[in-house]
Every structure is written in C-alpha cells, then in structure tokens.
C-alpha cells in the first residue's frame, strides 16, 4: 500500500495541530512512529483513506461504532435532527426519550444526567460520591483508564496502603494522594486497601470488564466481592461503562453479570458516534447534584438534540433480536482463527476475548492483571501492526487496545483478516 497523501497531510497537520494529532492515542509513537493514516470516509466495517486504500476496521473509533460506520438508521436520524436545529440551550423531549430508553435497559439507573464525554462523566460521578459520603479518597484499579481528569491520572503506590503519585505532568501531588490504586482481579489487595483506609474512602471506580489494557473479564465472584466489601465500608461502587455499556450486552456489563453499582459513568458508545457522556444511579445519591443538591455539574452542550437523536437511533438498532449473538459468533470465529495461526506459526501470543471484542497479546501468559499486559512484547506488536496495516487491516496502534467487531462485519471479513494474520505471522519468525 502507498500512503503518500497521508504522509503529506501529516506534515501539514504537524504545522498546525500540536503533535499532529488531537489525541495521543492516534499517534503511531507506540508502534515505532511514522505518519498515521488519514481517513476520508467510512461505511459499515470499512474505512477509506486519502490515498484510496480500503481497510477492514477493527479500531471502530476505540469501540463506540458498534453498528459500523455511517449506519443508515443512525445517519438518517442525525440528519433529520440537524435540519431542525443542533443546539437550543433548553430542555427537549429527546432528552426524556433517551433517558427512558437507558433506564429501561439498565435497572440501576434510577436517575440520569447527560454530559459531553466519558471523562466528564467519570469526573462527575466521583464528585457526586464524595458529596454523598462526605469522604475524599477514591480507589481505582491499575491499568484501567477513566479519562484525563486529574484525579484519575494517578500511578499506583508500592502497595494497597500506599497513596498514588501523579501519572501526568500538571497533576498536583495533593490530588494524586487522594487515590489508592490496586491490581484488578486481586480481591485480597482490594480488601487490604479498604481495611487500611476505611472511612476515608468515598468510592471505588472500576471498569467491570477491562477495556484499556486489552479485554480482561473479572474473575468469578470478583465484582460481587468488590460490592460487598465496599458497601460494608460505607463507600460507593462506581462502574465506568464508557466502553462496556451496550458493547457486550444490551444492559451493559452490570446487567450481563447481574452485579449492580451505585453510580455508572457512560460515554463513547451511547451516542451512536457523536460526542456524549452520561452518568446515573440511585436516586438518593443522584439528588446530591444541582439543582436539587450541593454538588455542581453543568454543560451548555449536555443533552444536545443531535447526540440525543443519535443515541436513541443507536439503541433502536441494538435492541433488535440477535445482535449480540451475531457479535459473539463473529468474535469466536476470529478468536479461533487467531489461536490456530498462533499454533501454526509457533508465535508467542495469546488471545483474550469478551464476546465481540478481543485483544491479541504477544506473551505466553493468560492476561488477567495489568502487569502481564504491560510486559507483553511491544516490539512484536509494532511489527505485527504494520504488517497488518499494509494488508488493509486497521487496528489500534497500541498493544493495550482491543479489536472491536460491529454488526456490519461479515464472516468473509473475518476470513480475509485471518489470511492477513497468516502472512504477518509468517514474516515474524
């Protein structure tokens, strides 16, 4: 494949946009550098770049495009609303309709508020939890990404009794020291942290299924034990379902496992591809938020008609029979093919799959903790990434990210992808 136009445009982008990208995850720094491919359009499971190359897309905007690019039902709904106005600054009936659909799908959402991103949603749930409990400290799990607000850009201390340190320049140490980070899937470490910090802890923040050091499911009983330990301490459970809501199950990961939090943060997927966020939970807790309570949250774009319309249209597609069974079947076909090719070529690699999403790790370990993902072979992934890109397979440029399937991928797409993997593995010996 030729990337001449992408390379030209990247030089121009470098001149005007800091770092040439508007999110560092779009850079190819983690896969050895080079100009990121500039995309021009998308349709279904495919992307098309400025050089005219076609890709089977497994990035899917890091997960939210579960119905594929430019799904007709969603694009028509958005176009219809755009003709009526994009932003009013007033309440609309669409907000009520969308909130009702979300609450019908997810039983824990007694009350809902819309915001504009997953980062904003998580940030606000933390504020609400602190207001409700009148405590300050937060527990989170190593390797889980919760956006880029100060309180969640915190690296782990040396153990459950140790406070965190800033994971980004510009985050004050005083902020980081309100956060305790423990290993995911390690209930003993979590209990130790709760026992040590006790009534200083406002809430635990958890991705019920990890999406940011690859796809990692909770060990059996882990979420139930987190709930029990947390509630016995008088603290709240916050689920970050920015990636997981509606990705694996219509009612989110919490309804899939039948383990429900006190508060939930949403983003990405629920807007049908438009910028969106939301949070919700028990009425008693949510009533801490203005105008009913003392915890402040506001936003000019929050609940804007375009995002509401896109979200409603998305859920209308996902609530149809057979959607998640189809995604699971495609995911299994891809997983089985990858495992077969790993064996064929004697590649040191393993696969974690959760329904219609998976991660290929270049390691011989089954990944259940962040350290295992971090220690996987980044150089091998970088080589694999570029071999796949040159065959028209678009993956996230990071060893930590998932491959996301959509309702528009086909068995033929999976088979074409596996043919590309076969070649890539043959070049990696």
Swiss-Prot record:
Molecular function as annotated in GO: glutamate-1-semialdehyde 2,1-aminomutase activity; pyridoxal phosphate binding; transaminase activity
SUPFAM superfamilies: PLP-dependent transferases (SSF53383)
Annotated positions of the N6-(pyridoxal phosphate)lysine modification: 268
TM annotation in the entry: none
Keyword Cytoplasm listed: yes
Entry-linked CDD domains: OAT_like
Catalytic activity: (S)-4-amino-5-oxopentanoate = 5-aminolevulinate
Subcellular location(s) of the protein: Cytoplasm
Family to which this protein belongs: Belongs to the class-III pyridoxal-phosphate-dependent aminotransferase family. HemL subfamily.
UniProt protein name: Glutamate-1-semialdehyde 2,1-aminomutase 1
């Amino acid at each position: 494949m030729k990337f001449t136009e992408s390379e030209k445009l990247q030089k121009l982008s470098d001149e005007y946009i800091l770092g040439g990208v508007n999110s560092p995850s779009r850079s190819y720094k983690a896969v050895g550098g080079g100009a990121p491919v500039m995309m021009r359009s998308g349709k279904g499971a495919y992307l098309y770049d400025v050089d005219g190359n076609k890709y089977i897309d497994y990035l899917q905007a890091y997960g939210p495009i579960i119905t594929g690019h430019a799904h007709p039902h969603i694009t028509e709904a958005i176009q219809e609303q755009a003709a009526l106005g994009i932003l009013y600054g007033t309440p609309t009936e669409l907000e009520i309709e969308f909130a009702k659909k979300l609450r019908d799908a997810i039983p824990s959402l007694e009350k809902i508020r819309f915001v504009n991103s997953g980062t904003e949603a998580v940030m606000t749930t933390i504020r609400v939890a602190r207001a409700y409990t009148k405590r300050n400290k937060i527990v989170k799990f190593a390797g889980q990404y919760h956006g880029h607000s100060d309180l969640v850009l915190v690296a782990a201390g040396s153990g459950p009794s140790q406070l965190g340190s800033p994971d980004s320049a510009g985050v004050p140490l005083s902020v980081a020291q309100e956060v305790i980070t423990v290993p995911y899937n390690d209930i003993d470490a979590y209990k130790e942290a709760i026992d040590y910090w006790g009534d200083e802890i406002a809430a635990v923040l958890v991705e019920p299924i990890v999406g940011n050091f690859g796809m990692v499911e909770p060990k059996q009983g882990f979420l139930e034990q987190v709930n029990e330990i947390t509630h016995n301490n008088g603290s709240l459970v916050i689920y970050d379902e920015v990636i997981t809501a509606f990705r694996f199950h219509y009612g989110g990961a919490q309804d899939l496992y039948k383990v429900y939090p006190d508060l939930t943060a949403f983003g990405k997927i629920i807007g049908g591809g438009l910028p969106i966020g939301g949070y919700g939970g028990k009425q008693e807790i949510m009533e801490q938020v203005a105008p009913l309570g003392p915890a402040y949250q506001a936003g000019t774009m929050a609940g804007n008609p375009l995002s509401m319309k896109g979200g409603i249209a998305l859920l209308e597609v996902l609530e149809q029979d057979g959607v998640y069974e189809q995604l699971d079947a495609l995911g299994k076909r891809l997983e089985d093919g990858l495992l077969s090719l790993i064996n064929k070529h004697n590649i040191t690699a393993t696969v974690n799959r959760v329904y219609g999403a998976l991660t290929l790790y270049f390691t011989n370990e089954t990944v259940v903790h962040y350290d295992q993902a971090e220690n996987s072979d980044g150089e091998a992934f970088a080589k694999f990434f570029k071999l796949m890109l040159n065959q028209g397979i678009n993956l996230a440029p990071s060893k930590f990210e998932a491959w996301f399937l959509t309702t528009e991928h086909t068995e033929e797409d999976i088979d074409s992808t596996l043919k590309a993997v076969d070649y890539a593995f043959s070049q990696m010996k």
